[in-house]
């Protein structure tokens, strides 16, 4: 709690001398209102740059797309983007996967700092209220230099609502209902900007029952309840801005155990989790010379309790994290450069009756610098980052026996990126990027020793693990015309000391972390056709091949590699700008997942997944009254034909017996009501 008081005191001291100023300059920390890639601004590389000037593969999920999407959490909302997938445990717990890599190989950024919970766990989701997310930036590969270790697969940057224009106030009331799991989702938002004093407050609540499908019926233990409160108070002045943000998030998800009776019917599950995530962030930007000095300091506390039957407490973790980031960004003529330091301090405590990982302390610091130069036909970009991480694990005696031993490890690593964009013609672009990534093994991989409730296994760490190092090469082509836009993004990624969890024997539940060399290659293709103005035919294809080198056939493929995926959406804009209705559309979508036969079969770790195809239907409109938007209404039907299927990335596929299928048909209706005050 001391960290919270320090941040609050720092903000008060900063703002007090300028509270009497009357400037009304509004300085947005980022701009992401445009949906076209050429106009989108991205912030997760090393500063702020246009996406069209980034050699590294990057995509942006625009605010309207998030509004039109029916999902159960923010990862579920972006998991249909090319190259992005999700590992799920039921309908309420999702973990992001980028080009076949997930867990601690992806950094999720929220409120400007990296989100730190217990992301090493299979059934540990991302503790973020989806209602607070305005847009999402997806960086693929280790090209980002701002976050150091763990950003090997990429970065998900969750952007909050932009600051309101000067002199305006707005309230928003929203609600959504989904039929399959009877989920109700409510949110209330109040934001404004008066005389450069800016604020944004939001409350959200989500209640969901057990989801169901045609084969398993009701999936006991898949229910969840979520509550969140977030706020921002700040100053926008001619010298820059200072924003103080806070959030508190609480979710109570059930844990699907998958046990069945003699008739094959699923039995009720009493296991569940309680997770609390509290955060406070001081975000400052000062205009100095021809650039800006940006500083962020944040404190997070993540508390995770896992209960078994009869409310018996098992695992109980409390994680404290202090994040810091100071960097300078300058743009002059055709040059842009940035340099800074960032890192974090962590302390994790074991407070439960059962133990999986030891208590530990971690300190992480990194320094980075990057430069970009624009020419008539070329954009050249490059940068380096050096990281140092110290980890100390505490010993623990359990019933007179040593459960965890005391040990310390130090890790050092270099991250780098060198890329170019060549503008072949006004319609064609080519992108090249070579990047080097680094990831230190996490405490779970080094020191686990216990049964993990909800994962169906006993996990064993490996003290001898070394850091992962990767080299990734990206090649991309963009084409844009009046009737056709297309993107091709190809990659190859070689990882040394790739860490994975392998089953020790075919009939047991013991798993241990191992390491080896891996190679991933694949890419994404997007083709959008607009033969007539109101009709859009959008297609994507994603593929990744992930293998371990120098391994026998049964352990050749990396576990949890996404199946090849083809998506098509046919959308018709019925009314663009009517007297009462605006942006009215109807859309028919298809998701085709090909057979995944590239599986890690050693000791029955994985099984093949057959192909399946899902159809979705959606519609939406804005409603106007006297020329002003008074409501937005969206209708979504997913898995329209109620197909029984198991995703290759669903952990419930490996529940007892035949496993458990994903959600059946689901119809959702969402209403958003903006109120300008």
Residue ranges and their predicted role:
Residues 438-439, 494-496, 537, 592-599, ...:
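C-terminal beta-signal and adjacent terminal beta-strands/loops
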Residues 491-494, 513-596:
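Gram-negative outer-membrane beta-barrel transporters
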Residues 58, 75-114, 134:
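Extracytoplasmic beta-strand/coil segments of soluble accessory domains associated
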Residues 263-283, 405-423, 429, 436-487, ...:
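Outer-membrane beta-barrel signature, preferentially recognizing the C-terminal barrel domain
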Residues 114-140:
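Short acidic/polar hinge/loop motifs at secondary-structure boundaries
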Residues 160-192, 219-222, 270:
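Short strand-turn segments of transmembrane beta-barrel domains in outer membranes
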Residues 23-26, 208-216, 220-226, 240-323, ...:
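Flexible loop and strand-edge segments within Gram-negative outer membrane beta-barrel domains
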Residues 22-67, 103:
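Short, acidic, small-residue-rich periplasmic hinge/interaction motif at the N-terminus
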């Amino acid at each position: 709690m001391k960290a919270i008081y320090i941040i609050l005191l720092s903000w008060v001291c900063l703002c007090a001398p300028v509270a009497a100023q009357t400037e009304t300059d509004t300085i947005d920390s980022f701009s992401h209102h445009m949906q076209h890639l050429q106009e989108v601004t991205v912030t997760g590389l090393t500063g702020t740059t246009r996406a069209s000037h980034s050699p590294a593969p990057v995509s942006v999920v625009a605010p309207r797309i998030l509004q039109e999407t029916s999902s159960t959490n923010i990862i579920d909302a972006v998991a249909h983007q090319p190259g992005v997938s999700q590992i799920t445990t039921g309908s309420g717990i999702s973990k992001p996967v980028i080009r076949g890599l997930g867990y601690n190989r992806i950094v999720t950024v929220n409120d400007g700092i990296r989100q730190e919970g217990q992301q090493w766990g299979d059934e540990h989701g991302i503790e973020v209220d989806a209602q607070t997310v305005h847009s999402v930036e997806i960086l693929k590969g280790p090209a980002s230099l701002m976050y150091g270790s763990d950003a090997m697969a990429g970065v998900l940057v969750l952007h909050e609502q932009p600051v309101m224009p000067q002199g305006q106030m707005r309230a928003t009331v929203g609600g959504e209902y989904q039929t399959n799991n009877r989920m109700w989702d409510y949110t209330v938002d109040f934001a404004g900007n008066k005389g450069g004093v800016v604020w944004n407050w939001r409350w959200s609540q989500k209640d969901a029952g057990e989801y169901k499908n045609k084969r398993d019926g009701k999936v006991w233990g898949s229910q969840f309840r979520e509550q969140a409160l977030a706020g921002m108070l700040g100053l926008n002045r001619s010298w820059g801005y200072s924003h103080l943000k806070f959030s508190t998030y609480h979710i109570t998800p059930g844990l699907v155990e998958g046990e069945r009776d003699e008739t094959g019917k699923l039995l009720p599950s009493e296991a569940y989790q309680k997770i609390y995530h509290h955060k406070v962030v001081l975000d400052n930007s000062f205009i100095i010379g021809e650039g800006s000095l940006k500083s962020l300091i944040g404190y997070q506390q993540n508390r995770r309790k896992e209960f078994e039957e009869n409310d018996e407490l098992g695992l109980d973790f409390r994680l404290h994290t202090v994040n810091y980031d100071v960097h300078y960004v300058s743009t002059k003529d055709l040059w842009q450069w940035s340099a800074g330091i960032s890192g974090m301090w962590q302390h994790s405590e074991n407070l439960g009756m059962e133990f999986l990982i030891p208590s530990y302390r971690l300190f992480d610091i990194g320094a980075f610098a990057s430069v970009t130069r624009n020419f008539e036909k070329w954009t050249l970009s490059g940068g380096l980052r050096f990281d140092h991480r110290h980890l100390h694990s505490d010993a623990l005696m359990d019933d007179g026996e040593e459960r965890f031993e005391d040990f310390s490890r130090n890790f050092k690593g270099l991250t780098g990126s060198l890329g170019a964009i060549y503008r072949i013609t006004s319609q064609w672009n080519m992108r090249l990027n070579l990047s080097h990534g680094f990831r230190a093994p996490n405490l779970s991989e080094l020191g686990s020793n216990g049964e993990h409730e909800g994962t169906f296994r006993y996990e064993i760490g490996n003290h001898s693990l070394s850091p992962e190092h990767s080299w990734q090469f990206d090649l991309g082509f963009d084409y844009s015309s009046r009737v056709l836009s297309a993107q091709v993004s190809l990659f190859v990624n070689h990882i040394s000391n790739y860490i994975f969890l392998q089953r020790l024997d075919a009939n047991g539940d013991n798993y241990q972390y191992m390491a080896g060399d891996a190679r991933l290659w694949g890419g994404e293709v997007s083709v959008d056709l607009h033969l007539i103005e109101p009709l859009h035919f959008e297609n994507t294809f994603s593929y990744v091949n992930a293998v371990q080198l120098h391994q026998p056939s049964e352990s050749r493929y990396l576990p949890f590699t996404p199946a090849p995926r083809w998506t098509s959406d046919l959308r018709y804009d019925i009314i663009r700008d009517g007297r009462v209705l605006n942006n009215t559309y109807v859309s028919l979508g298809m998701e085709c997942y090909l057979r995944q036969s590239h599986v890690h079969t050693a000791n029955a770790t994985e099984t093949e997944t057959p192909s399946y195809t899902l159809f979705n239907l959606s519609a939406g409109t804005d409603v106007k009254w006297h020329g002003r938007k008074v409501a937005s209404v969206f209708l979504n039907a997913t898995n329209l034909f109620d197909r029984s299927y198991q995703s290759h990335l669903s952990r419930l596929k490996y529940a007892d017996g035949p496993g458990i299928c994903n959600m059946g048909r689901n119809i959702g209706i969402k209403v958003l009501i903006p109120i300008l005050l």
